[in-house]
Amino acid sequence: MSWQEAEVRELKVGRYILIDDAPCKIVEITMSKPGKHGEAKGRIVAIGVFDNQKRSVVYPVKHKVKIPIIEKKNAQVLSVQNNEVQLMDSETFETFVLPLDPEIADKIKPGMEVPYWETMGMRKIMLQN
């Protein structure tokens, strides 16, 4: 299990949430007041960590949502070829291949150490811009 639960009212901008089983960073939260026929609702707008897709959901404020547990790790770049990067984890020495993001392609060189995030069975290189 790489997620935990939290109520909608506990969420804040900048934190993470699972929407359609995709980890997303919250960019906007608006809470409505309780009305005559229902409880307060929270509207969450978030952007996918791995696909940069904008997602929006509406839940009652007492609704439990899934929060992904994101592991932040470091890896050494072994090689860069054909839009793929071969990495070796700095702690476990496990080697794995990730697709190369065109935005960071010119910044990644063999031998350098890069941070990457791992959650829900997915990994992504997270270089600082």
Swiss-Prot record:
It comes from the Archaea. Keywords: Cytoplasm, Hypusine, Initiation factor, Protein biosynthesis. GO terms for cellular component: cytoplasm. It is found in: Cytoplasm. This is Translation initiation factor 5A. The gene is eif5a. Coiled coil: none annotated. InterPro entries: IF5A-like (IPR001884), IF5A-like_N (IPR048670), NA-bd_OB-fold (IPR012340), Rib_uL2_dom2 (IPR014722), Trans_elong_IF5A_hypusine_site (IPR019769), Transl_elong_IF5A_arc (IPR022847), Transl_elong_IF5A_C (IPR020189), Translation_prot_SH3-like_sf (IPR008991). One of its GO terms (biological process) is positive regulation of translational termination. Functions by promoting the formation of the first peptide bond. Belongs to the eIF-5A family. It comes from Thermoplasma acidophilum (strain ATCC 25905 / DSM 1728 / JCM 9062 / NBRC 15155 / AMRC-C165). Disulfide bonds: none annotated. Gene3D superfamilies: 2.30.30.30, Nucleic acid-binding proteins (2.40.50.140). GO terms for molecular function: ribosome binding; RNA binding; translation elongation factor activity; translation initiation factor activity. The modification Hypusine is found at K36.
